[in-house]
Amino acid sequence: MKHRQAFRTSCIAVGAALVVQGTAAAAQDLPVWDTYTYENQVAAMQELIASFKAEHPDVNVNETVRSLDDLSLTLRLAVQAGNGPKVSQVNQGAKDMGTMAKSGLLVPLDDYAEEYGWGAGQSAGLIDRGRWSESGQFGEGPNYGISSLGEIVGLFYNEQILKDAGVTLPIADFEGFLDALQKVKDAGVAPIAMGTAEGNLPLHLYASIFETNISAEDRAPFDDLIYGRGGSWTTEANVKAAKYLQDWAEEGYLLDGYSGISANDAVQLFTAGQAAFLTGGTWYFGDVQNNPDIHFMPFPAPAEVEHPLSVGGVDPGWTITSIASTKEEQDLGASFIQHMVSPETAVVWAKHGYLPATALPEDADVELSGLLKEGISIWDELNADNAIGHYIDWSSPTMLDTVGDNIPLLLAGRQTPEEFAAALDADYQAYLQSQ
């Protein structure tokens, strides 16, 4: 789950109406909403829509770009009102895709997935994150969305700051990370870039501490928790993760003034060398890649965990909404989605510094940034180990708000780790009972 405050609308004329002897051949309109607000993402989308133009000269793509928060607030209501997009990205969790699928606001994509062979470019484990059953079961039933980008939440680090502080690289495990935090603090540098005024950096840090305690071989209970099959957020690992987060705030490991800093500003401060570490996602590659000292690694796990999970998965899935009410409109929407997840599009995303969910062609002619090389290597290893974890806010429609309301209390010492875990669990159990 990523956030960037932005709202941008553009109408890209994918072909123009042809006027022949005074008669206009009307172009098809394809309203599209997406969340690609970062500068390099905008550039990639402009290139991709331009290439769609070459294939579909009779289509007008009306693109609206929103932050994920804005999309979540407006999309369902817009589609219900009949004035939303025909194609849109939708966050895969219960709050958004689950609710819209259950309400009949999304079109199943299984026939198109078979027609276009989407399963050849993305693993079943990734595609299953767009599935919702008629009974509201996450990860099962029809597929409603497929993604352009893979996402890993890992640990960005400034190599020069760590060397200056006497930290030995690579950091082997969680104990080594704890040692590095103290050495950086002793050197007079903020160990962790953090901002809680807007965005989800503390959520991703909490989830990373928690999920790296889970080995891929033992992930079934966590999968059940996220997919709404039952479980608890009050386990020892959940409480310990909250305790670490609170301790780091109390010990001054977080960027000074973090409560008044947004996630985006924290990323910029990290890029400028104001902190040693940033726990964030691969969607930040384009933002931080201009600093050659910055590298990316999986979040360090306890030494005894053989194949630790990493928070992540895929970016919001491309969907066809019920606004596309005819077969012709749905076919057009599917052709646009195919364009967004094709191997050729994977090359475009890689060229702009992002991690594509669809595998790059073996003969792809693209020069990868150092960060992206690191990201792809980690992505391939995590996929091979079945160790791509989850975004914890997918577990209920209100979990993102619950985490966002309670983490500031935890960091400020106004809530114990046990109370924090209990708040998450109360949200989750209420959701299970409502099903």
Where are these regions (language model features)?
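Extracytoplasmic/periplasmic substrate-recognition and gating elements
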Residues: 50, 54, 81, 165, ...
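Extracytoplasmic/periplasmic solute-binding protein
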Residues: 134-148, 153, 178-230, 275
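Hinge/lid segment of periplasmic solute-binding proteins
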Residues: 94-152, 205, 296-298
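Short, solvent-exposed loop/beta-turn-alpha elements that line the ligand-binding surface or hinge
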Residues: 110-125, 212-240, 301-310, 370, ...
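Extracytoplasmic/periplasmic substrate-binding proteins
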Residues: 35, 95, 204-205, 209-214, ...
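Glycine-centered hinge/linker elements that transmit conformational signals in sensory
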Residues: 181-183, 223-258
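C-terminal capping/gating helix-and-loop segments adjacent to ligand/active sites or protein-protein/ligand interfaces
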Residues: 355-362, 375-429
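Conserved N-terminal structural module of periplasmic/extracytoplasmic solute-binding proteins
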Residues: 15, 25-105, 114-121, 169, ...
